[in-house]
UniProtKB/Swiss-Prot annotation:
Name of the coding gene: FASTKD2
Record protein name field: FAST kinase domain-containing protein 2, mitochondrial
Main location as per UniProt: mitochondrion
SMART domains assigned: RAP (SM00952)
Organism: Homo sapiens
Disease: Combined oxidative phosphorylation deficiency 44: An autosomal recessive mitochondrial disorder characterized by onset in infancy or early childhood of global developmental delay, hypotonia, and abnormal movements. Combined oxidative phosphorylation deficiency is present in skeletal muscle. Most patients have seizures associated with status epilepticus. Additional variable features include optic atrophy, hypertrophic cardiomyopathy, stroke-like episodes, and increased lactate levels in serum and cerebrospinal fluid.
GO cellular component: mitochondrial matrix; mitochondrial nucleoid; mitochondrion; ribonucleoprotein granule
Biological role stated in the UniProt entry: Plays an important role in assembly of the mitochondrial large ribosomal subunit. As a component of a functional protein-RNA module, consisting of RCC1L, NGRN, RPUSD3, RPUSD4, TRUB2, FASTKD2 and 16S mitochondrial ribosomal RNA (16S mt-rRNA), controls 16S mt-rRNA abundance and is required for intra-mitochondrial translation. May play a role in mitochondrial apoptosis.
Amino acid sequence: MLTTLKPFGSVSVESKMNNKAGSFFWNLRQFSTLVSTSRTMRLCCLGLCKPKIVHSNWNILNNFHNRMQSTDIIRYLFQDAFIFKSDVGFQTKGISTLTALRIERLLYAKRLFFDSKQSLVPVDKSDDELKKVNLNHEVSNEDVLTKETKPNRISSRKLSEECNSLSDVLDAFSKAPTFPSSNYFTAMWTIAKRLSDDQKRFEKRLMFSHPAFNQLCEHMMREAKIMQYKYLLFSLHAIVKLGIPQNTILVQTLLRVTQERINECDEICLSVLSTVLEAMEPCKNVHVLRTGFRILVDQQVWKIEDVFTLQVVMKCIGKDAPIALKRKLEMKALRELDRFSVLNSQHMFEVLAAMNHRSLILLDECSKVVLDNIHGCPLRIMINILQSCKDLQYHNLDLFKGLADYVAATFDIWKFRKVLFILILFENLGFRPVGLMDLFMKRIVEDPESLNMKNILSILHTYSSLNHVYKCQNKEQFVEVMASALTGYLHTISSENLLDAVYSFCLMNYFPLAPFNQLLQKDIISELLTSDDMKNAYKLHTLDTCLKLDDTVYLRDIALSLPQLPRELPSSHTNAKVAEVLSSLLGGEGHFSKDVHLPHNYHIDFEIRMDTNRNQVLPLSDVDTTSATDIQRVAVLCVSRSAYCLGSSHPRGFLAMKMRHLNAMGFHVILVNNWEMDKLEMEDAVTFLKTKIYSVEALPVAAVNVQSTQ
């Protein structure tokens, strides 16, 4: 005889008397041990669960029917569950009953946010099968009331040790389900972490198609409101990591219950909840939960005792968190600084980068700990530190030198690709580790077979950007090996990758014939220009300039039809001060030109005309009457700190190429550092530029002394 589970509004008024939805789950478990059921779960389009329940072999108590009148309506009350007896009396088989169960909060459609069409769980089945979950319970009439048949509670750790696959865990659940269901999800995730990627994908497919998986998901939703909060969080984390989509009813229900019970969070739960939020993709329920999490952290931040928990919370708080909350967490971390372990100090860089908070005090103190314990530092830690420094724009020269010196000292134990990755990160920071780069060049020359297409491009970009091959002893060997390796990939390389490689060679003032000739083909040039990428146009302009100004006579000088590039904008603040200093030094603005645009899209901030010995400045009005052979053109460039390698006066690739090309156009180049000029008083600035502009022979003795102190 069928017993149908209907919405509460369809039963008698008397059944509405109890509104405690939480008690329903406890009674439902008790009821399920007394009644053997076969449930068919159907999901409507709103995501509301409407199960049909079939009861058979009713035997609640052997002598229960002896106490009932056959003509009366019997009501068996489990708070929210009512059983009405028909006029045929109680029977042990074939009883006709109607059970009205109320599901008010957990699965009520209006109380949940959904991003898209929902399903309980994702299964590789047809649409009809996705809407249906069959749950079967077989309980013996003789054993339902005996303690001996009650399954023993099993921990997730024991499950993960006894089972070898995800399906084994589900088999264990189907044989004897125990509370809480979170143990099964946690055990499956523990097992999945031990598997390879291919095994993990295969096991997940088996998990989704397992007959007991949907039953486990339903148990998880039923128990979400009554299990311990930490188990709820453990299960949510495991479910997300197992790859169950977030837009399923299961995940969204657990998110909603987690929101409702967030005040139960203790320090351990804060750590787990942080990990859960970090693993989840943005959605409405995640946003609401993250907002509640931030409020909770703001209230409990001073109560956090474990440093690791504090760092996990800080990492999860988000880049868009209120600045007041970030500063409060920073103050808490500073209070705990004496308790930081080496691992805590190493991890702090990544934590601050995750919350986009540049705390110089924390970074400086942690840098000291990292340097003091640099030996044995794993590559992963060094990569995280360098990447975080880039994100935070934190340039600690001592830290970078210490890391580079450690890698150079242990160079023989590092694999080729690991050293290259470290060098790429250093290039991103603008730092030039001379010793390490020399060792890496030597390895490339000795073992060119280790080069492939990807690392060829990375090496060329790194060395050209940092201008490292300039005046190196083995420059010729290095660039020849790189050119030879690139030539071997010309038949498979893409046009953009070829352009990147050739541009790097241009910066290094080296022009291998085969790559250049292939790039200069008209069809490849047209392909690069049709992409509407201004970077391609800029690099082609650079190539065209090198063909005209550098020593490339053996290459074909093709007239390239290139789009016009936007003009470079000068730094108005610094240029104004330099213009004032030049006017005071040279005797008026008639002795220099400002904002001069040259051929090949080059720009200089100031131009001065002098005699060939740079002893005398010539007024601009007298230049036309003087032979060009008697004039020395002086280009004054106002450059930023980023134009140099970090912590040095070594120019980076583009500035070095620009100086080379200006020299080819007949200019004597003077570099004026913006940050230094801003700090100088007018008198000191005049003296500084005087020593730069005039030759040593033309300076008075006092000026020479000033120059020697710079």
